Amino acid sequence: RDGQGVYTSGDGKWTFDGAWVNDKRQGQGKMAEVSGEYVYIGPYVNDQRHGPAVVQFGDGSVFRGPFVNDVQKGPGELTFKDGRKITGEFLDHMPNGQAVEQSTAGTLNGVWSNGMLNGKVLVTYPNGTRFEGMYASNKRNGIGTDFLSDGSREECNWVNDVRQSPCVRITPDGKRIEYKAPPARRN
């Protein structure tokens, strides 16, 4: 194959619309699964996805970012149908490294690994309160501090998104109040 054209895979599961050179995809092209679950629009080099691209998923989400030698990696942006957006480092369309997630519920800024928060995270809520602490496998785990709108802060240990007692509330004037935390409380 040489030149511009549309190719359908032998099993009928995907199509490619773009340029061919010596039977290899080369230049701008569009590869789409017939099911609609995955559509890649971007450049090909020597039959591999390579360069800045847009990927549309069947659930309505859209990824924008680079591919290198047929692997998606580097800075990108993933926008979901509900308006939620993740911007930062990606690997295989998942946040991997430093990234920020923005939604109507607030902003999560932290370290991601294979699409999950793992490490230090700062969560800022629309009402101005914020949480700083550690996450493991997308859940709060370890010491975390909630900074409240009245100027006080609450320090607790978390296990799988559940506060562990005792917790300490520190008022704006520095008074420390130890208390038993209700389970799974969120701001």
Where are these regions (language model features)?
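Glycine/tyrosine- and acidic-biased, solvent-exposed loop/turn segments at the edges of beta-strands
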Residues: 1-187
